[in-house]
From Swiss-Prot:
Protein name in UniProt: GDSL esterase/lipase At2g03980
Classification via Pfam families: Lipase_GDSL
Signal peptide: 1-26
Gene3D superfamilies from the UniProt entry: SGNH hydrolase
């Protein structure tokens, strides 16, 4: 067995111990928890950014792409698919958890394929955000509203051909809808002069409008992933003083949005009957990988500050993993594959934590 295989086996066993899977809360689950954590979903629809993009940006005129090595080195066949990792994304692991196939990218499907797929589609687009103007400087972008537009087209042009009206209503009501977007709004549009509260309110307004659109289209079960601690990611910590410390001001700004989002979802459970929200606290999960405080590296086994690609990352000068970039030999020793995105191992760790720790993923209840 080579070093890479040994590390894979070692870390998987280690993670099972660290996450203490056997200590799941044994109290009787709520009805919503039974549905969202153990539901038999017919389909999985994904809306978001590069965290969950499965290849839509391959088909866009944009500088943000990952359809080249060393991306995908640990994916099936070692192929770069357009996922921003060395392997699977968190959306992939969620699909696997629910017994569904990996969700294909909308723009990579032929019309015939769109007509035949009934287990879900991925509309996520790297570099894009909640606001329409986010990411325009890097090329064509599929904003949150555009992705919802595409889902509406899926209903009109494809799903209606496969389902009777009552069947389609049931299909949509029983399917799971994941939304994982918002970090690029902070990356491109937020700075030290921006009022964090006003900015969060602006994002939230547009975000909730799109949830309402999805609900009107028939969605009833949502998986809402909050925004990551951007201030602790390699592209940021490489430029902080002291180097490696988080930008706490940026994290605080993001946390304002996350808090508002969670409260708004709680109110929505009262507004929308028979609608459930599973809230994923991705922010605190990723922050927790660093250790007890945001400026303390919490693991001697995993590199939590530097990316695997590029392997040489000096002061933020190399800001992306590009064609020809040399990656580290063992991605499973890193939390981040590139300066902006987690490794497959980190995504796998998240999936375990999400479905076995209610502090990470939990059903939103009424206030």
């Amino acid at each position: 067995m080579d070093l890479h295989s040994c590390l894979n086996s070692y870390f998987l066993l280690l993670l099972l111990c660290l996450l203490n899977i056997t200590t799941i809360n044994s109290t009787k689950p709520l009805e919503q928890e039974t549905v969202l954590f153990g539901g038999n979903f017919p389909a999985f629809y994904v809306i978001g950014d590069s965290l969950v993009d499965s290849g839509n940006n391959n088909h866009l005129t944009t500088m943000v792409k990952s359809n080249f090595p060393p991306y995908g080195s640990d994916f099936e066949g070692g192929k770069a698919t357009g996922r921003f990792s060395n392997g699977k994304t968190i959306a992939d692991y969620i699909a696997i958890y629910y017994g569904l196939p990996l969700v294909p990218a909308y723009l990579g499907l032929s019309q015939e394929e769109k007509n035949s797929i009934s287990t879900g589609i991925n509309y996520a687009s790297a570099g894009c955000g909640i606001l329409p103007q986010t990411g325009r400087q890097i090329g064509t972008c599929l904003s949150l509203s555009v992705q919802v537009d595409m889902f509406q087209e899926t209903i009109t042009n494809n799903l209606k051909k496969n389902f009777k009206k009552s069947e389609l209503r049931e299909h949509l009501a029983e399917s799971l809808f994941m939304i994982a977007i918002g970090v690029n709004d902070y990356t491109f549009l937020f700075n030290e002069t921006t009022d964090a509260n006003e900015f969060a309110n602006k994002l939230l307004h547009d975000y909730l409008l799109q949830i309402e659109r999805l609900h009107k289209l028939g969605a009833r079960k949502f998986f809402i992933n909050n925004i990551k601690p951007l201030g602790c990611y390699p592209n940021v910590v490489a430029k902080t003083v002291p180097r490696g410390s988080c930008n706490d001001a940026l994290n605080f700004a993001v946390s304002i949005f996350n808090t508002k989002l969670r409260k708004s979802l709680s109110r929505m459970t009262q507004k929308f009957i028979k609608t459930s929200f599973l809230y994923s606290d991705y922010y605190n999960y990723m922050l927790g990988l660093r250790g007890p405080s945001s400026n303390q590296v919490g693991s001697s086994l995993l590199n939590v500050t530097s990316p695997c690609c590029p392997n040489v990352y000096d002061g933020g000068q190399l800001t992306s993993c590009k064609p020809g970039s040399i990656a580290c030999k063992a991605p499973d020793t890193h939390i981040f594959f590139d300066p902006f995105h987690p490794t497959q191992l980190a995504n796998y760790m998240y999936a375990i934590a999400c479905f076995h720790e209610r502090s990470i993923c939990h059903v939103i209840l009424e206030d």
